[in-house]
Design a protein with these regions (language model features):
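Acidic, Mg2+-coordinating active-site environments of NTP-dependent enzymes
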Residues: 7, 11, 70-75, 184, ...
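N-terminal leader/targeting and accessory segments in enzymes
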Residues: 1-90, 94, 231, 239, ...
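A short acidic, helix-capping loop that chelates divalent metal ions and anchors anionic groups
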Residues: 72, 141-146, 204-209, 382, ...
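ATP-dependent carboxylate-amine ligase
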Residues: 1-14, 32-38, 51, 249, ...
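Short internal beta-strands
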Residues: 62-68, 232-236, 375-376, 400-407
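Short acidic/polar active-site loop segments enriched in Thr and Asp
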Residues: 62-63, 172, 194, 399
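Short secondary-structure boundary segments
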Residues: 66-69, 178, 200, 236, ...
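Phosphate-binding loop of NTP-binding sites
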Residues: 7-12, 87-236, 240-248, 281, ...
């Protein structure tokens, strides 16, 4: 069906007499508008798209959508809507013919565990013979389609374009991370989620949401705004999971590591060698064998098992998929050093994730007398209140700490570092303005059985500084160090 302005805005309340204008593309970036395109003006935190309406029209926009009254002396139609972000979502879904209506889509949200749960579920679905793509922090993981990492959840236009490409390439299943920003900004408003998953919630992104309550409300949308979903899987070991379970508007499956609920990890052994045990789901028992480590990963395995079961995946495929899902990029990735020490890279960047990762390493260390060296930092232009908290958490577990930049963005590195230092009670740390130097110092210090853990960046291959992406990789530095020695 030919894309027209009337078709793209179908179903948006309050709009009447929409002209049948052909539309050849959609963009929220006026500089990218080509003749025949629809321009949708978005008022963002840094830029107001309404100021660029004249540029969009000069570039040939066939129509413009805005939330404001706009005086236009030209013939270009200006359509006023109550919410431009919702309009982008609807227009993008219509333009690309609602690809998620034709696929099975799982949406996963939570402060921590989204990527690991998504990777586990993707592995399970592939073991069951389902052509599955994964969308999230790691980018788009799909055979034959390579997309760079960007936002955890892409903007609405990019998202529906990617989903359309995946559908046309024969993909039947999509596993998608849904960030709080995406939910708050209506980026996934017109995604047809068949199943949803809640991993956990802890204070994070308060620089954006303002309060933990608003952050929670954004996450809750995934469980209250999609009434056509088949089921929701909820980790009720987290206090916010219990609240969501009570609010959810679709059938729920509760998971727990500690209580006998819908799906539970009845007996488990978590060691440096992996996670083993039995997950009980009604009359079915799943034998779990995973090389992943940590209680937090056992929770992720539980969520992935639960949603797989409700999707109708067979027992063998679930067990095989979990067993085959080994190291997840940037999540507890380990590297052996020539000194006999071990380096670990993890994406952890919240207080809760720090606690879980560091406590797991401390608990599972072979040599209790060995040293733990932690290389870390905090992001600039983000929630400042957590910086001293994260410093205090690191001090609790580390023999020595190396405070370094981690995407300082437009803040001074020295200011961020000082706010981290405020959480320390002792002077068992060194401070660096260059992360590479800090990481190499830690690697040189480590001897047999010691652990060097670099937190925050995971598989990121850049430092975000002063509106630029500067090439940088913890993993490359560790690999180069190993080869040099």
């Amino acid at each position: 069906m030919k894309n027209t302005l009337k078709k793209l805005l179908k179903g948006i309340n309050g709009i009447k007499n929409i002209p049948e204008i052909p539309i050849s593309g959609i963009s929220t970036n006026s500089a990218l508008i080509k003749p025949g395109n629809l321009y949708i003006a978005i008022k963002g935190n840094r830029y107001d798209g309404n100021k660029f309406i004249p540029e969009a029209i000069n570039n040939g926009a066939s129509a413009v959508i805005t939330e404001y009254d706009y005086s236009n002396k030209l013939s270009t139609p200006i359509i006023k809507v109550t919410n431009s972000r919702k309009a982008v979502s609807r227009a993008a879904a219509e333009y690309y013919d609602h690809p998620t209506k034709k696929m099975s889509v799982v949406g996963i949200t939570g402060t921590n565990g989204k990527t690991s749960t998504a990777s586990l579920l993707t592995s399970i679905l592939k073991s069951a013979g389902k052509k599955t793509a994964q969308i999230g922090t790691l980018g788009i993981i799909a055979q034959g389609l390579s997309k760079e990492k960007g936002l955890t959840t892409p903007d609405s236009i990019t998202l529906h374009q990617n989903l359309s490409e995946l559908y046309n390439d024969g993909y039947t299943h999509i596993v998608m991370e849904a960030s709080s920003h995406a939910l708050d900004q209506y980026r996934v408003n017109d995604i047809d989620f068949n199943y949803t998953v809640f991993t956990n919630l802890y204070p994070e992104h308060l620089d954006y949401h303002g309060t933990i309550e608003k952050y929670f409300e954004a996450k809750t949308k995934l469980f209250t705004s999609y009434p056509n979903s088949t089921a929701a899987v909820i980790n009720i070991d987290n206090e916010y999971g219990k609240i969501i379970s009570n609010r959810c508007t679709v059938p729920i499956i509760n998971t727990s590591m500690i209580s006998n609920t819908d799906i539970s990890f009845l007996d488990n052994k978590i060691s440096i060698d992996g996670i083993y045990g039995t997950i009980k789901a009604g009359k079915i028992s799943y034998n779990i064998k995973s090389s992943m480590i940590g209680t937090f990963n056992a929770e992720n395995i539980l969520c992935a098992t639960a949603v797989s079961k409700v999707m109708g995946i067979n027992k063998k495929a679930i067990e095989d998929g979990i067993s085959l899902c080994n190291t997840i990029p940037g999540r507890m990735e380990t590297f052996s050093l020539y000194s006999g020490a071990t380096a670990i890279v993890d994406y952890a960047h919240t207080p809760d994730a720090y606690t879980k990762v560091l406590s797991t390493i401390k608990e599972l260390m072979i040599d209790s007398e060995a040293n733990i060296y932690v290389v870390f930092g905090c992001g600039g232009n983000r929630d400042k209140s957590k910086r001293s908290i994260m410093g205090a958490i690191v001090e609790q577990f580390a023999t020595h700490s190396f405070i370094t930049p981690d995407n300082p963005r437009n803040e001074k590195i020295s200011v961020i570092n000082q706010e981290i230092i405020n959480g320390f009670k002792k002077n068992n740390f060194d401070v660096f303005l260059d992360r590479e130097k800090g990481l190499k110092t830690a690697l040189n210090k480590a001897v047999k059985n010691d652990i060097v853990i670099a937190l925050g960046k995971g598989r990121e291959d850049y430092q975000e500084m002063n509106d630029e992406l500067i090439p940088y990789s913890d993993i490359n530095i560790i690999n180069e160090y190993s080869h040099e020695n």
